[in-house]
Amino acid sequence: MIKQRTLKRIVQATGVGLHTGKKVTLTLRPASANTGVIYRRTDLNPPVDFPADAKSVRDTMLCTCLVNEHDVRISTVEHLNAALAGLGIDNIIVEVDAPEIPIMDGSASPFVYLLLDAGIEELNSAKKFLRLKQAVRVEDGDKWAELAPYNGFTLDFTIDFKHPAIDASSQRYFLNFSAESFVRQISRARTFGFMRDIEYLQSRGLALGGSFDCAIVVDDYRVLNEDGLRFEDEFVRHKMLDAIGDLFMFGHNIIGAFTAFKSGHAMNNKLLQAVLARQEAWELVTFEDEAKLPLAFKAPSFVMV
């Protein structure tokens, strides 16, 4: 039986909030089978839980938020959610003493290392996957995103940025997903933004944690970070990272092929909601026999330590 995963032990880290610029303490806790992914704000009394749920997602200019029925929100969940998807973590309590997850370096890599430091434990309960039975596509003008049946998980993402720093040849990326390929090829790709946008937001008391330490910053001509890019196609790789996190908002790894053109958080979420709304287009499956599990989800040795 392919089993659900959680953490072996509690781990903690501190970082800066993108919105407030203030220190945030992040605590990751193991959770029992079928708990799912739960984000928790401990700065509120009593603490407020936000189960990962496609319908709770709100897209803002800066990040992805989860919002409950009382309009209480937790922000900047997308990069940690991508790390959970990448390592196939089914059950976890994510606590922060702030309204947001810390931005760290703007990628998912610090979260991957934190999760691996905690260690990953299998639970005696079958892991559920969302498997596509029919193709589902959403569009908005020239932007679109699609999930289609495929016995594995692939992502094919194209961006269309007219900018001197983003070469035309580095605007499309294809990934045959596995935990290894996610960690090596996607998790280190950082979020990006324009210097003028960051300055404007900070003048209005927003994005106070935004800096060269947590994003690729560009002006009209070039990348301003002294160290440059981690990959020549880091921009599109980060958009793929975002998509992996967005599509995991249902709490289950997806068996299917994802293709997108100029998609972002809102479009990715619209696609996930469209899939879930069409009950004939998908099914939840478990695997008693590991031989039948798509290669994409075989547990690599570095994860199951």
Curated annotation (Swiss-Prot):
Active-site residue list: H265
- Keywords, in A-Z order: Hydrolase, Lipid A biosynthesis, Lipid biosynthesis, Lipid metabolism, Metal-binding, Zinc
Question: Gene3D superfamilies per the record?
Answer: lpxc deacetylase, domain 1, lpxc deacetylase, domain 2
Q: Which reaction does it catalyse?
A: a UDP-3-O-[(3R)-3-hydroxyacyl]-N-acetyl-alpha-D-glucosamine + H2O = a UDP-3-O-[(3R)-3-hydroxyacyl]-alpha-D-glucosamine + acetate
What is the name of this protein? UDP-3-O-acyl-N-acetylglucosamine deacetylase
Q: Tell me which family the UniProt entry assigns to this protein.
A: Belongs to the LpxC family.
Q: Name one GO biological process term.
A: lipid A biosynthetic process
